């Protein structure tokens, strides 16, 4: 995938490989459950099928990588809303490089503080402000947040981002209007809702960030 974002953050790249499943008849909780199962499966698969590579990483790159991913595999992935995360960050006895306030797109330093210092393990952040998320994410009843989630893990920050998709045509149209989007170019997408859809969800799993290497250049090809 490719996205327009500055390169100031080593974990926020403009181009990277992803796996992007879509799940029919699923809500946000279903989405998070599948994400947790998939991440744990991938960790176990690497430990079982690439033991020499994992030992190499542990010896040459990150001496704690096997222990860290094993802890992720054995952990229950916690849940925390975006608003709760902002409250924790505002109360933190830490000076962040980037300002903290409700409505910001969290930086890696914020994400890692939440999962490493507040939770001490993997955590799903949910219910983000609609202004900082994509137009197709389902609007919550408060009309301020959307049914989105980001999985944060120690040592990395955001690993997976997902959401329940907006299946209601009128709400989707309003969200697009609020963002000033050209609906004519996305009429085909809107027609999928106009002529019948279903509750569904999906996510993007950033394969690039699963490597223990601190230099993504070595795993980006």
Label for each model-derived stretch:
Residues 20-31, 155-157:
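A generic structural motif
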Residues 9, 29-33, 135-138, 163-164:
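Short conserved micro-motifs at the rims of enzyme active sites and ligand-binding pockets
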Residues 21, 85, 125, 162, ...:
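A residue-level signal for conserved active-site and pocket-lining positions in enzyme catalytic cores
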Residues 37-153, 178-198:
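Metal-assisted phosphate- and nucleotidyl-transfer catalytic regions
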Residues 5, 9-26, 191, 197:
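Class II aminoacyl-tRNA synthetase-like tRNA-binding/catalytic domains
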Residues 1-11, 209-212, 216-220:
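Single conserved hydrophobic/aromatic residue that forms the stacking wall/gate
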Residues 163, 168-211, 221:
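Active-site pocket scaffolds in enzymes
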Residues 31-35, 81, 168, 203:
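Hydrophobic (often cysteine-bearing) scaffold residues that line and stabilize catalytic clefts
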